[in-house]
UniProtKB/Swiss-Prot annotation:
Residue ranges that the Swiss-Prot or TrEMBL entry lists as coiled coil: none
Function recorded in the entry: Catalyzes the formation of CDP-2,3-bis-(O-geranylgeranyl)-sn-glycerol (CDP-archaeol) from 2,3-bis-(O-geranylgeranyl)-sn-glycerol 1-phosphate (DGGGP) and CTP. This reaction is the third ether-bond-formation step in the biosynthesis of archaeal membrane lipids.
Protein name per Swiss-Prot or TrEMBL: CDP-archaeol synthase
BP-aspect Gene Ontology terms: glycerophospholipid biosynthetic process
Superkingdom in the source lineage: Archaea
Pathway where it operates: Membrane lipid metabolism; glycerophospholipid metabolism
Localization (cell): Cell membrane
HAMAP family xref list: CDP_archaeol_synth (MF_01117)
Transmembrane segments: 4-24, 54-74, 86-106, 122-142, 145-165
Annotated keywords: Cell membrane, Lipid biosynthesis, Lipid metabolism, Magnesium, Membrane, Phospholipid biosynthesis, Phospholipid metabolism, Transferase, Transmembrane, Transmembrane helix
Entry cofactors: Mg(2+)
Species this chain originates from: Picrophilus torridus (strain ATCC 700027 / DSM 9790 / JCM 10055 / NBRC 100828 / KAW 2/3)
């Protein structure tokens, strides 16, 4: 039987992956990853993917995870955490955050191959690659955590369902705050 509280808790634990993406928008813009290079006349990634955004966004995700870790630790919820201590939590947080932005970059790469320009609405290509790559990184680098919180796949499915409206809302906010050129 599925424990709904554990499923919701697992979604809460995924916050670093969600926060890494807007963190990349805040810190991005310096040292464009593809340096303007093309494949068959199409940009590899585009100007929206930068080293400063990748590293800065990932570190913001890790920082968010450290905050979540201590909230859980202090509140003594008893449902588990990223690790037994902050040091053992770091591989999970790094895998989740860097995986998230690796997925975002992968989505951009696919969009460019399909001929979609930067800022073009890519629907699920804008929304799911960061989630899926984050889970892949967690599975590879923190398998014990993955199996404990996402092994039954129900939380993964719910995160995939919740991501499109959440992603849209965050992008609208970024657009209204003049941090994004388009609201998607």
């Amino acid at each position: 039987m599925v424990n709904i509280i554990m499923v919701l808790y697992s979604i809460f634990l995924f916050l670093p992956a969600f926060i890494a993406n807007p963190g990349a928008v805040i810190t991005g813009g310096h040292f464009i990853l593809d340096r303007g290079k093309t494949i068959h006349g199409k940009r590899i990634l585009g100007d929206g993917k930068s080293l400063s955004g990748f590293i800065g966004g990932s570190l913001i995700g890790v920082l968010a995870g450290i905050i979540v870790y201590y909230i859980i630790y202090i509140s003594n919820i008893g449902l588990g955490n990223y690790g037994n201590n902050i040091i053992s939590a770091l591989p999970v947080l790094f895998a989740m955050s860097f995986g998230s932005l690796t997925g975002d970059i992968t989505g951009s790469f696919i969009k460019r191959r399909l001929g979609m320009k930067r800022g073009a609405k890519g629907s699920l290509l804008d929304q799911w690659p960061f989630v899926l790559m984050s889970f892949l990184f967690i599975f590879i680098f923190a398998r014990h955590f993955f199996l404990e919180f996402y092994g039954n796949f129900i939380a993964i499915i719910l995160i995939l369902v919740l991501t499109p409206p959440l992603h849209r809302g965050v992008n609208i906010l970024g657009y209204k705050l003049k941090m994004k050129d388009v609201p998607w």
